[in-house]
Amino acid sequence: MVVLITRQHPPEVTGYFAFKSYLSTILNENNLSSAFLEKYRVLAFPLMNPDGVDLGHWRHNAGGIDLNRDWSVYNQKEIKTTVDFISKTLKENDSKLVLGIDFHSTYYDVFYTNEERASTSMPYFLDNWFSSLESTIPNYKVNEQPSVSKQPVSKGWFLNAHKAVGVVYEIGDDTPRDRIKIIGKESAISMMKIMLD
């Protein structure tokens, strides 16, 4: 199973635009997407923080909490509901979560990844994915910043709770909209090809 989430932080809309392009590509109903969806279930959460968005908050929800710091504590309803739904879906379908991507925005395009890869179900996925992105997106250089997840953030939860590859996929605030569509589309195509290989 693959999990895609976005809008934990309300104003980070360029990440949401990449999420839309990514998800639309997966649901494209062509041979590649059909084969991928035959093999993998995708759970997509397009608005993790509806109250924060509605209230115009910068990083937190209606309770004043940054949702991307609650992924092992589960004090916030948004995270608890999401985690419960993912867990229920995995159990009902006897599935395994292999990849989780959390779309955000920041000053520039960057992928925040976990240093730990060997213990995941796809230890070479990121290397293959990033190599593919650089070869398919014109003038694109992957900016990866791996770290050990010490805070209760989504990428750490994907790794620690499920041994899945976890990525925080950040799009630059000023990345042009047409470029975001290309990056989102090519990222999804590359992911599907790698995971079907």
Walk through the language-model features, giving the residues of each:
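Active-site/substrate-binding loop(s) of hydrolase catalytic cores
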Residues: 1-135, 139-143, 166-173
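Active-site-adjacent mobile loop/cap segments within catalytic or ligand-binding domains
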Residues: 68, 109-120, 145-197
